[in-house]
Each structure stands twice: as C-alpha cells, then as structure tokens.
Amino acid sequence: MLIRKKIFFFIASLSFPVTVVIAQTASSKQDKYVFSVAQDGTGDYKTIQQAFDAVPYRNKKPVTINIKNGIYKEKLLLDSTKDFVTLTGADKFNTILTYNDHTGKLSPKGDTINTRTSWSFKILADNFSASNITFQNDAGFSAGQAVAVESDGDRTRFTNCRFIGNQDVLFTNNEKSRQYYQQCYIEGTTDFIFGSATVWFEQCHIHSKKNSHVTAASTPPDKKWGYVFNDCILTGDTSLHNVSLGRPWRPYAAVVYIHCFIGEHIKPEGWSNWNNTDNYKTTRYAEYKNYGPSADPLKRVTWARQLSDEEVKEYNLQKFLSNFIPAKNKTP
C-alpha cells in the first residue's frame, strides 16, 4: 500500500492532464477519500452535488472526485466546511459543468438573480483544485451578467480547464483569496475575468467575443498585487479591434501582463478608465515585454506603465501566492 500511495501523490503533482482510477480501500480511507461521479450510474454518485455533500463536515483530509464524461447541468455549491477537494474530469472537452442563471432571471424561490447569485459553480472551500473540466454558464450572449465560476476560497488551483460564457464569466471573489490558473482557456465578452482576489494566470489562453473589456479587477488599495498574466495568449473573434486589457471595477485595480501575446483585437491604447479620469491616479496597470500585433508600448495610455527589468523581478510566483503553489517557481 505504501508504494501505491507514493505513485498516487506523484501523479497528482503533475501539471498535465492525467486520468487516474484508484480503488477505494479500507486502508486508503484513513488518508483520503476517492469518489466517482457518472450520469449512467456506474460511479458512486450520479450528480456532482451529491459527491460534494458526501465530503465530511469540516473536512481536513484530501478528497478526490473523479467525474466521467457528460454534461452536468447543476447549480453547484462547495461549502466552506468542505476543504481539500480535488475535482478531476475525464476530458476537458467532454466533462462539462454548466447552468444558465443570469441577472434578471427569477430563482425557484422567486428572488431576482443578480451577478452575485448567477453562478453555475460557487467555491467557498479552501484548498480546492480542479483539472480537465469545462466550467460554463450557457445563459446566452445577450443574457447580461452570468457567472460560470465564483471562486471565494483561499488557495484554489485550476489546471487545464475551460471557462465558457459571456459577461462576468470568472468571478475571482474575496480579497483574501489566492488563486492559480495554469494552461486554462477562458472566453467571454465583457469583464469576463473580474474580482478582488490575488490571481496568477500561467500560460492561459484568453479569448474575447465582443468589443469590450477582458478584466475588471477590484483590487483593494492595501493589496500589492491583483491579477498577473504570465506567458498567456490573448485572442479575439476576427471582427474585433476595440477590446481593452482591463477597466477598473474599483479605483486601485492592479493588473499586469508579462510576456503575453497581444492579438490585434486589443485596441492600441490598451486600457480603459471606465469613464472616470480620477482612475488615472490610482489604477495599477502595467506590462512587460509583451509581443504581437497590439503590443506596441508607445501607443499605450500614459497612465499605464511598462515595467523595468528590475521591477519585474518582484513578480515571483512563489512570492506572489505566498508559497501555496508546490511546483517549481518560474520567474518572468
């Protein structure tokens, strides 16, 4: 059994997608829980929420939930008492978690849904991780704010996942939260990455579907960092040429793009002030050695910065996320 445990933890630490099936034995229960979800009844549960509910109250042990392919139309909540959960899909294109709530829609209880209640999946737990899954809000292009994932917990990690929707797709909520997204695909229309958390995006593909804004950070003034995009690719639909890298949801929004490909959909000036010139004085927008058709630093707004070689050294992954990422540090 000792050998099998070592193999499991080695595989779980790899960054590329791996599907692992491990039998749940009496001895393994002492160290972790492994559940499976399958809509056809071949797993431990038919729905993901059932698997979440099976996680022990105030859990302190690793729980792995393996999800078989399927479209799981559920409004999912991972409670704050359900820490240390790992969600693993069989295939990121065919393991789809989706729902269709949006602002203005009535909930089953008769309440009017708003941005903060429109989520398809809300994570309140700490130490959550996911890989090989599509997270989606399929409310539609004209539905308004419709969150696919609201991530509130601390030390959350997504690897090789897809986030699909339109406006307000990925809500990185909670100013005390630290989050890491590695090799993920995120697409949307307006402010589709937004919130107050400290977040590092590593080698992600960010795709715009409308002439609007990629980010809407609300970084608190006392937080040194907000969003960092490192070695990412920014693309847009072919008809787009007026997308901004971000606009400040709050005055001290902090967003940095480092070594990123900036597609021609991004407007030359790069950034938006959200129609408030006072934001010139407080926003913390910067870039470093980006490349691509819309990466010319000479055309950027004067109130955004280009980092120096010395300044960029501060953007150290382990330092940025206070050492919760186990992988080797990569300094830009």
Q: Where are the language model's segments positioned?
A:
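Bacterial Sec-dependent N-terminal signal peptides
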Residues: 1-30
